[in-house]
């Protein structure tokens, strides 16, 4: 079965910017001006070039005049190689997997920074990878696949691809492939 990769935007493909008030999320230019997490962005571009089945799966504020439009502008700028048909936007608060084109299998990977999204996905039978963006996973309680935004992302992601498709791995953590891997199956 061919794996599918569903990648979150806010805090994953794009930075998560600290805000003083939720009203900032409704301001024109907020989403369009987010900086990309460049290591992950480059890895996603490489996966698309390799013919992998890649989707964006991102929540948006449905009561915002700008959020959805600006997320598409952002994707057009930073990831133009991803067709519009592969962009799935979910109203904030809704469960992401309910918006997929078909039922989740263990070969459907969600890369997301938000634990609730990952737990929902895993409960439906998908495989989850928590994206570490520098502001999440502070307490280190996540017990599952981890992918860190750093220069080793390509090596680490390739390790996941090479080792997790035959049988999904329940949990492991690594920071650098040159170090020992901690695995728990």
What is the role of each PLM region?
Residues 14-17, 54-56, 63-67, 95-99, ...:
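Short catalytic/ligand-binding loop motif for oxyanion handling, primarily in non-cytosolic enzymes
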């Amino acid at each position: 079965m061919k794996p599918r990769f569903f990648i979150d935007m806010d805090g994953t493909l794009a930075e998560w910017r600290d805000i003083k008030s939720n009203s900032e999320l409704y301001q024109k230019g907020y989403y369009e001006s987010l900086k990309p997490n460049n290591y992950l962005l480059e890895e996603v571009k490489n996966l698309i070039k390799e013919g992998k089945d890649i989707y964006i799966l991102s929540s948006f504020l449905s009561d915002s005049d700008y959020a959805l439009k600006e997320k598409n502008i952002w994707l057009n700028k930073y990831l133009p190689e991803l067709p519009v048909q592969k962009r799935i936007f979910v109203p904030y608060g809704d469960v992401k997997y309910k918006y997929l084109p078909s039922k989740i299998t263990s070969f459907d990977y969600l890369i997301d920074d938000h634990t609730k999204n990952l737990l929902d996905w895993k409960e439906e039978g998908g495989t989850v990878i928590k994206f570490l963006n520098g502001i999440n996973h502070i307490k280190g309680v996540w017990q599952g696949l981890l992918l860190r935004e750093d220069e080793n992302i390509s090596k680490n992601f390739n390790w996941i691809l090479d080792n997790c498709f035959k049988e999904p791995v329940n949990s492991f953590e690594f920071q650098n492939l040159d170090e020992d891997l901690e695995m728990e199956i």
